[in-house]
């Protein structure tokens, strides 16, 4: 009786798959059909292997699937999953060939709802940045030497102990004021803002620390509220925010004048060690000494240069005497030449008169006129030269050292007769001679003082 069923013995061998080939084909199909995907569920059967890999089951009310997260990915997770945690995983759907089971190969894991929180974080950050709350030009510099530091945190927080320990170590002279507030939980954001506003209103401190230790994103969420950011920006005191660990960033960090990676780092930024104070003061003092020395050196050089240009009174008198002698010689020469010329002209006219007797009266008149002119010229020239001579004599008299002494000045000379011109040439208990207008005196030096201008 014929049948429509194929005969198994007649199926070509080339169309038969091995189990391994089947699993490989299914694995490729799964990977192509399901790229990296976010999947939400509850963790159960969590195991952390000695190799560092994580094995767990991800389930919901109706189904479950096995998952693995290898050590290379697990080490970057900021929390350790626990039984019953609600999480979201980013994973590839793969097939574990040895057992033929499909599973999730997890690339990243986060607590459930973190995605929504992160979106809210980005939206608020963009809004406040657009308003200019994060503008670097708005941020205030920290005081160079803070005497009082305010702390906004929980009295029970480990961060407070870290801050106080750091302040005691670095700057025990600094006064610390605590503005207590819850740092997580319902209503914490409003209370944090109130504590910051209180510190600003009291104006008791030079800088304000807003801090808490590390935790999950939910634990730190109070510092991502808009009211906290706006209160920080409106605070009249420079604010340092140190929340969580170095990798944690909150809205408060962006609003602060300075962001510190940890509470301890915030305390270090706020408190300048006393040794650093002293070092800075020493540096400033050294700079002032060097500047003063340079100024004194420049003044001394200028004084030395001016002293070399200054001519002594005796040299000035000698120079004026030589000039006076020169003028006297020129005056005598100037009077002799016109007189000789006049005498020559007179003799010439006399000869002409003698040869021309009929014109004697005319010649006499000419001679008289020439004589008159000659006399006037000689008187004018002589008066001018005498006036210059009197002026030079008056100048010479003004430079006479005796006249200077008569005006109340004195000339001081040492034991060797050298004139003393500067205080540096004198020493206490030295005997000197003081020359006055009408005599001299021997005196002893009690002390020497210099006048700096």
UniProtKB/Swiss-Prot annotation:
It is found in: Cytoplasm. GO terms for molecular function: exodeoxyribonuclease VII activity; nucleic acid binding. Its main location: cytoplasm. It is an enzyme of class 3 (hydrolase). It catalyses: Exonucleolytic cleavage in either 5'- to 3'- or 3'- to 5'-direction to yield nucleoside 5'-phosphates. Bidirectionally degrades single-stranded DNA into large acid-insoluble oligonucleotides, which are then degraded further into small acid-soluble oligonucleotides. Keywords: Cytoplasm, Exonuclease, Hydrolase, Nuclease. One of its GO terms (cellular component) is cytoplasm. Its EC number is 3.1.11.6. The gene is xseA. GO terms for biological process: DNA catabolic process. InterPro entries: Exonuc_VII_L (IPR003753), Exonuc_VII_lsu_C (IPR020579), OB-fold_nuc-bd_dom (IPR025824). Belongs to the XseA family. This is Exodeoxyribonuclease 7 large subunit. Heterooligomer composed of large and small subunits. It comes from Herminiimonas arsenicoxydans. It comes from the Bacteria.
């Amino acid at each position: 009786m014929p049948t429509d069923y194929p005969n198994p013995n007649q199926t070509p061998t080339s169309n038969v798959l091995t189990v391994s080939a089947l699993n490989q084909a299914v694995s490729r199909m799964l990977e192509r059909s399901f790229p990296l995907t976010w999947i939400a569920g509850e963790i159960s059967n969590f195991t952390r292997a000695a190799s560092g890999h994580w094995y767990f089951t991800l389930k919901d009310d109706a189904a479950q699937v096995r998952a693995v997260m290898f050590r290379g990915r697990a080490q970057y997770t900021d929390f350790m999953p626990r039984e019953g945690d609600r999480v979201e995983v980013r994973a590839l759907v793969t097939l574990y060939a040895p057992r033929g089971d499909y599973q999730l190969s997890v690339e990243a894991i986060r607590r459930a709802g973190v995605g929504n929180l992160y979106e809210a974080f980005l939206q608020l950050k963009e809004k406040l940045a657009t308003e200019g709350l994060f503008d670097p030009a708005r941020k205030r510099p920290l005081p160079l030497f803070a005497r009082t530091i305010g702390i906004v945190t929980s009295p029970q927080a480990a961060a407070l102990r870290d801050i106080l320990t750091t302040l005691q170590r670095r700057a025990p002279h600094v006064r610390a004021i605590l503005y207590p507030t819850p740092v997580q939980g319902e209503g914490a954001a409003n209370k944090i803002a109130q504590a910051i506003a209180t510190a600003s209103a009291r104006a008791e401190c030079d800088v304000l620390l807003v801090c808490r230790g590390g935790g999950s994103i939910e634990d730190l969420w109070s510092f991502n509220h808009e009211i906290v950011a706006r209160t920080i920006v409106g605070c009249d005191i420079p604010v340092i925010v140190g929340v969580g660990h170095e990798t944690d960033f909150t809205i408060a960090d962006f609003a602060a004048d300075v962001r510190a990676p940890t509470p301890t780092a915030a305390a270090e930024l706020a408190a300048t060690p006393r040794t650093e104070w002293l070092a800075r003061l020493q540096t400033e003092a050294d700079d002032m000494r060097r500047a003063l020395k340079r100024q004194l050196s420049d003044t001394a050089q200028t004084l030395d240069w001016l002293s070399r240009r200054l001519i002594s009174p005796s040299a000035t008198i000698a120079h004026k005497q030589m000039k006076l002698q020169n003028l006297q010689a020129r005056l005598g020469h100037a009077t002799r030449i016109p007189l000789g010329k006049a005498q020559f002209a007179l003799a010439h006219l006399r000869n002409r008169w003698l040869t021309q007797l009929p014109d004697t009266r005319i010649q006499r008149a000419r001679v008289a006129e020439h004589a008159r002119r000659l006399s006037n010229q000689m008187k004018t020239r002589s008066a001018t030269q005498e006036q210059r001579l009197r002026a030079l004599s008056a100048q010479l008299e003004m430079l006479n050292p005796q006249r200077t002494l008569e005006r109340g000045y004195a000339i001081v000379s040492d034991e060797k007769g050298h004139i003393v011109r500067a205080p540096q040439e004198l020493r206490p208990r030295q005997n000197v001679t003081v020359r006055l207008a009408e005599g001299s005196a021997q005196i002893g030096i009690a002390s020497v003082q210099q006048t700096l201008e």
